[in-house]
Amino acid sequence: MELKGKKAIILGDRDGIPGPALEACVRSAGAEVVFASTECFVUTSAGAMDMENQRRVKELAEKYPKEDLVVILGGAEAEASGLAAETVSNGDPAWAGPLAGVQLGLKAYHIFEPEIKEQIDPNVYEEQVSLMEMVLDVEAIVQEVRSIREKYAAW
């Protein structure tokens, strides 16, 4: 999946990779950021993705062709990252927000995934992400987000 020319929805994590760092990375790869947020994944109610972010993602999926959109995650742990990926592709599993029962089919990638990382300017990645890559469980996060994408993403 090539980032260049895509419209990126950025869902950063206060305890992982924040929105501004993700924005810098995807912009360096040629994507247009259409929405960026930093939330506290572990703070959200009942493990659900932030309600306002769900609303914005839904609006963007209605505004742009879904095949032009990509969601880039910065979650600090696998479960929260997987939950966000599932919400934007298959609907809110907590049935708590605007995406409850709404299957957008959007592709979500974590910034750590090799197919995303290799498209980012190495200097930008080093400055914005590499420190967190050293302290988080990259393998578990990548595996979880990839499995959700392979199961639910349609575009």
From Swiss-Prot:
It catalyses: acetyl phosphate + [thioredoxin]-disulfide + NH4(+) + H2O = [thioredoxin]-dithiol + glycine + phosphate + H(+); acetyl phosphate + methylamine + [thioredoxin]-disulfide + H2O = sarcosine + [thioredoxin]-dithiol + phosphate + H(+); acetyl phosphate + trimethylamine + [thioredoxin]-disulfide + H2O = glycine betaine + [thioredoxin]-dithiol + phosphate + H(+). It comes from the Bacteria. One of its GO terms (molecular function) is betaine reductase activity. The keyword Oxidoreductase applies. Its EC number is 1.21.4.2, 1.21.4.3, 1.21.4.4. Keywords: Oxidoreductase, Selenocysteine. It holds the Pfam family GRDA. GO terms for cellular component: glycine reductase complex. Monomer. Component of the glycine, sarcosine and betaine reductase complexes, together with components B and C. In the first step of glycine, betaine and sarcosine reductases, the substrate is bound to component PB via a Schiff base intermediate. Then the PB-activated substrate is nucleophilically attacked by the selenol anion of component PA to transform it to a carboxymethylated selenoether and the respective amine. By action of component PC, acetyl phosphate is formed, leaving component PA in its oxidized state. Finally component PA becomes reduced by the thioredoxin system to start a new catalytic cycle of reductive deamination. Belongs to the GrdA family. This is Glycine/sarcosine/betaine reductase complex component A. It comes from Symbiobacterium thermophilum (strain DSM 24528 / JCM 14929 / IAM 14863 / T). The gene is grdA.
